[in-house]
Amino acid sequence: MSENHLQGKDKSSIVIGLKFGDDFVSMMTFCKSRYNKNYMWELSRYAVKRNTNVVGGFSRLLTNFRQNHSGSIISYADRSYSNGDVYYKNGFKLIKTNPPSYKYVNLGKSIKRMHRANFMKKKLAPGDSRPEWKVMFDAGYKQIFDCGTLSFCIA
């Protein structure tokens, strides 16, 4: 997951995957809903091995999860990379279009995007008069803006 998802691996409690031979070619992760408590689960990551096409991978992994876990699911599609088509095709409903936001990336180390919540100024430099972006810039990070997200749910 860490090599094949822009945000890297996460700390989800449920990880399911599809294998071809001995290699995982597709993975999906779930956790208890973090931001919207109206939903039981959050589909937090879906990744496919680079240079690999897994036809029906999303639907097979989602079906497996739903056969083994009850409750509603929420997920978010980054509009920079997705129009949400895979969600619509699998029965999800669009519930909200979220405005653009930003993440950080340290180009000297990795291209993984790191959520801004990990770098709040009050955690990094309490009492520092510089704005958050400047604290991060001075530490070698660049601010990357996205196109917003789409929030989807399925009962």
Region spans (language model):
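Short, amphipathic alpha-helical interaction segments positioned at domain boundaries
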Residues: 114-117
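A conserved beta-strand-loop-helix scaffold within acyl/acetyltransferase catalytic domains
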Residues: 2-102, 109-112, 135, 139-154
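Surface-exposed acidic, glycine/proline-enriched linker/cap segments
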Residues: 119-141
